[in-house]
């Protein structure tokens, strides 16, 4: 079993010193490493009260001050991101941290990232599926041939840098819909469940859906 922390780079009410808040977050990650925790994840937001629009940048700074702890984006709002740049950021973090990078891909809990980056929120699910497939293609292949609906095609182009870990861990972050659990299982991706209040027992049937979908797709438990 591994024990870790998922956190945000938030500004407390009445606090306006963003530099101080980020430095304190990096200090907390360093302390978690010293205490022997296994992972530390940072979420992504594009709101006034958060400073974590670029979790990989914060995690890269933390990588320089830690030795063992795994560093994860949790979650990266993949629906509103470019999978090429996302993979490059993940791979760069993996190089800086000497193989400690992980990523949790999610659709996001807030909508502001979509208009900010030129996407329509009504394409929420379709964007995520297309971009997740491209991200996994990039992870598996140095040279990529790809075409889709929401991004220009990639015609046998190499994507660098490549990470130390092969494959670099990519998790799927899900909320409470059976479809999301089934998708993660069918794709053979590890699962991060966002439990925001309520009774945790309600997630057991969803975990069963995840495991059954993985089994039917031929993936190991």
Predicted feature descriptions by range:
Residues 16, 72-80:
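The substrate-binding groove and active-site-proximal loops of carbohydrate-active enzymes
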Residues 51-58, 198-212:
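Active-site-adjacent beta->alpha loops and helix N-cap segments on the catalytic face
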Residues 8-10, 45-47, 76-78, 106-110, ...:
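Active-site beta-loop-alpha junctions enriched in small/polar residues
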Residues 15-19, 51-53, 83-84, 116-118, ...:
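Short, solvent-exposed loop/turn segments at secondary-structure boundaries
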Residues 3-7, 40-42, 71-73, 101-105, ...:
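Hydrophobic faces of well-ordered beta-strands that scaffold small-molecule active sites
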Residues 1-70, 166-168:
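N-terminal beta1-alpha1-beta2 module of alpha/beta enzyme domains
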Residues 1, 82-189, 201-208, 216-217:
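Internal, glycine-rich beta/alpha segment that forms the wall or movable "lid"
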């Amino acid at each position: 079993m591994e024990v870790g922390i998922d956190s945000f780079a938030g500004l407390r009410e009445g606090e306006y010193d963003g530099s101080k808040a980020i430095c304190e977050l990096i200090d907390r990650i360093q302390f978690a490493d010293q205490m022997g925790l296994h992972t530390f994840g940072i979420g992504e937001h594009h709101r006034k009260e958060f400073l974590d629009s670029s979790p990989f940048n914060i995690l890269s700074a933390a990588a320089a001050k830690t030795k063992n702890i795994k560093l994860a984006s949790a979650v990266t709002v993949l629906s509103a991101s470019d999978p090429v740049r996302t993979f490059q950021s993940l791979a760069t973090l993996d190089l800086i941290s000497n193989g400690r990078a992980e990523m949790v891909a999610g659709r996001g809990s807030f909508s502001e990232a979509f208009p900010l980056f030129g996407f329509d929120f009504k394409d929420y699910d379709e964007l995520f599926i297309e971009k997740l497939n491209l991200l996994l293609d990039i992870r598996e292949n140095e040279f990529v041939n790809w075409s889709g609906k929401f991004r220009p095609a990639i015609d046998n182009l190499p994507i660098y840098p490549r990470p130390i870990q092969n494959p670099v861990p990519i998790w799927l972050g899900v909320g409470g819909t059976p479809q999301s659990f089934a998708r993660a299982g069918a794709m053979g991706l590890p699962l991060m469940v966002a439990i925001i209040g309520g009774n945790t027992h309600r997630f057991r049937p969803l975990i069963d859906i995840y495991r059954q979908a993985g089994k039917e797709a031929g993936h190991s438990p």
